[in-house]
Design a protein with these regions (language model features):
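Flexible "cap/lid" loop of the alpha/beta hydrolase fold
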Residues: 117-118, 122-164, 191-194
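Active-site nucleophile elbow and catalytic-triad environment of alpha/beta-hydrolase enzymes
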Residues: 185-204
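Bacterial N-terminal signal peptides
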Residues: 15-27
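Conserved loop-alpha-helix segment in the C-terminal half of the alpha/beta-hydrolase fold
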Residues: 215-242, 248
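Active-site catalytic motif of lipid deacylating hydrolases and related acyltransferases
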Residues: 35-94
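Gly/Ala-rich beta-loop-alpha elbow adjacent to hydrolase catalytic centers
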Residues: 100-105, 109
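Short beta-strand/loop motif that positions the catalytic acidic residue
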Residues: 211-213
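Catalytic active-site module of serine/aspartate enzymes centered on a nucleophile-bearing elbow/loop
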Residues: 235-266
């Protein structure tokens, strides 16, 4: 074989190696850019008659997948204080975040989500009122089984709770009796007036939103959740057979939607 032919083959091999190396470098760069573009911080907001511990399954998945996760513990003593508690946690974030709310927490994130640190909102079987609206009135559009039951009780000083004997039926039908009983006995009483608090500036009007519909929700009518999503032009997913406690019973589906929001919100 002539020296010139050998040189051509060496040059061709070198060229191919360089092309492969450049292709790999480009792929790695794009992957790094996409990873960098993904929102890394997640803030979770629980709903009425619950506390932040219900997010444990979702928290574990998100942390394993590399997210920084914070959980708000609302006092439920007033809507304003719940919004303030949420904004307090938002102020601790080191960058953009996805703000997630369950149930009554949806109203809280709608009000608190105008914070500049919030890149997107995720509603998990949650209320999504507009300006001047409150969740109590919105609930009348599509009444829930819970709203027509005797399960909601009120204390002498105006705080509501769910009758522990009926908690599983209306809130957590897809959880074990033991887990539902613990949640019923550890529920945080919620000021009744919170459900009538009007939204001033709904964050979903200016930021991207996602809605998870729990198809067997008896606390919020699934049709109301669908209506909210359609009005807000939210990205919507439905979890078949899930109760209102979908964030506890179906953490994989909930975490997947949050991660989708983190990948697409800007």
């Amino acid at each position: 074989m002539s020296n010139s032919l050998k040189a051509m083959r060496v040059a061709r091999g070198t060229s191919q190696s360089l092309c492969i190396a450049l292709l790999l470098l480009t792929c790695c760069t794009l992957s790094a850019q996409n990873e960098h573009a993904r929102v890394r911080n997640i803030v979770l907001v629980h709903g009425a008659w619950a506390d932040g511990s219900g997010w444990k399954g979702v928290y574990d998945i998100l942390v394993k997948d590399g997210f920084n996760v914070s959980i708000v513990q609302e006092p439920e003593t007033s809507f304003q204080e719940d919004v303030a508690a949420t904004k307090r946690v938002l102020a601790l974030q080191d960058g953009q975040c996805i703000l997630v709310g369950h149930s009554y927490g949806g109203a809280v994130i709608t009000e608190a989500g105008t914070d500049p640190s919030v890149a997107g909102l995720v509603y998990i079987a949650a209320h999504m009122p507009d300006a001047g609206e409150n969740e109590a009135d919105d609930g009348k559009r599509f009444p829930s089984d819970l709203s027509q039951s005797t399960a909601i009780k009120k204390t002498a000083d105006g705080f509501t709770y769910l009758d522990p004997a009926q908690f599983r039926e209306y809130f957590a039908a897809d959880l074990s009796a033991e887990q539902a009983s613990f949640m019923a006995r550890s529920q945080v009483l919620n000021l009744a007036d919170n459900f009538k608090a009007a939204i001033t500036a709904p964050a979903w009007r200016t930021k991207p939103s996602w809605m998870l519909v729990a198809t067997k929700d008896r606390a919020i009518n699934p049709d109301l959740e669908r209506w909210y999503a359609e009005r807000a032009k939210s990205h919507k997913v439905e979890v078949s057979g899930a109760s209102h406690a979908v964030y506890v019973s179906r953490p994989k589906e909930v975490a997947a939607l949050i991660e989708e929001a983190a990948s697409h919100a800007r």
